[in-house]
């Protein structure tokens, strides 16, 4: 079954399983790094919001031999996990005073998001772009944000500096830093990634950590939290290697570790192509944190 036929089958079969007053749409959704996914939206007429379920991964399930019935069950299960239970009033976004304490920043690839960056306020940082969002995760059953666009900034009547100040105060408070032992995490969650990492260094015996946030979502921005890198450098004994594992986290280790730095960039590219979703790739090279100057390069 080709992809277009798969989408039609999903739409037809899901519609047949819903009550008559429900509506279903499939539409393209722009994601990070210029990726476009097909989003399934199941609309309950009682509420003004609905979760978006991306169908592209389910097609890979189908190609791997998973039955259509099992895929339909999984899609409906996902919908039930995130279906709305009340209306969501988005009008508060029109008033900056109501969202000022919800402004956060996120780190994304600069090169891979050139088209998106034309319409949003951002700051260039190394090979990344710092963009700004309104965090609405507290009001929704999933990690929810609304990207701050140039149009929204104009509506608020503020400048980028105001966004920066608000986000620096809010992001560490809303999404506190989380530092996780990498060996323990990868052995449990990502054995494939762990095996690839062993080809570069003996990470089982080295002090290496995952730097993310409390939600482990869009957590790579935690490297920007005031004092986080300097504090971690004291723990690790000096300068550090920073590896952009994905938009969700950085891997951090001592610079003087027994690690093959020459092959590290090649390793990052390989992991990006095999273990990280296209829309979650952050960077393709490593960085160094200088503990004496408190800078990253």
In which residue ranges do the predicted regions lie?
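Helix-rich interaction surfaces within compact, conserved domain-sized segments
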Residues: 267-289, 294-296
């Amino acid at each position: 079954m080709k992809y277009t036929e798969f989408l039609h089958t999903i739409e037809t079969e899901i519609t047949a399983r819903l009550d008559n007053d429900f509506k279903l749409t499939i539409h393209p959704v722009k994601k990070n790094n210029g990726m476009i996914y097909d989003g399934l939206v199941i609309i309950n007429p009682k509420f003004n919001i609905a979760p978006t379920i991306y169908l592209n991964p389910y097609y890979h399930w189908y190609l791997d031999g998973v039955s259509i019935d099992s895929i339909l069950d999984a899609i409906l299960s996902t919908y039930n996990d995130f279906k709305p239970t009340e209306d969501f009033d988005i009008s508060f976004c029109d008033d900056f005073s109501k969202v000022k304490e919800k402004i956060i920043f996120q780190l994304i690839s600069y090169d891979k998001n050139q088209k998106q960056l034309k319409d949003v306020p951002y700051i260039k940082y190394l090979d990344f772009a710092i963009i700004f969002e309104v965090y609405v995760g507290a009001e929704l059953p999933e990690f929810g944000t609304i990207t701050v666009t140039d149009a929204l900034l104009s509506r608020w009547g503020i400048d980028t500096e105001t966004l920066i100040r608000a986000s620096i105060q809010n992001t560490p408070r809303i999404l506190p830093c989380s530092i996780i032992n990498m060996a323990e995490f990868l052995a449990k969650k990502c054995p494939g990634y762990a095996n690839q990492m062993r080809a570069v260094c003996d990470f089982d015996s080295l002090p290496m950590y995952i730097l993310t946030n409390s939600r482990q979502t869009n957590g790579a921005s935690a490297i920007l939290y005031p004092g986080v890198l300097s504090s971690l450098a004291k723990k690790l004994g000096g300068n550090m290697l920073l590896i952009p594992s994905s938009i969700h986290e950085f891997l951090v280790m001592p610079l003087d570790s027994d690690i093959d730095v020459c092959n590290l960039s090649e390793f990052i590219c390989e992991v990006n192509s095999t273990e990280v979703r296209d829309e979650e790739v952050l960077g393709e090279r490593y960085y160094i944190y200088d503990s004496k100057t408190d800078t990253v390069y």
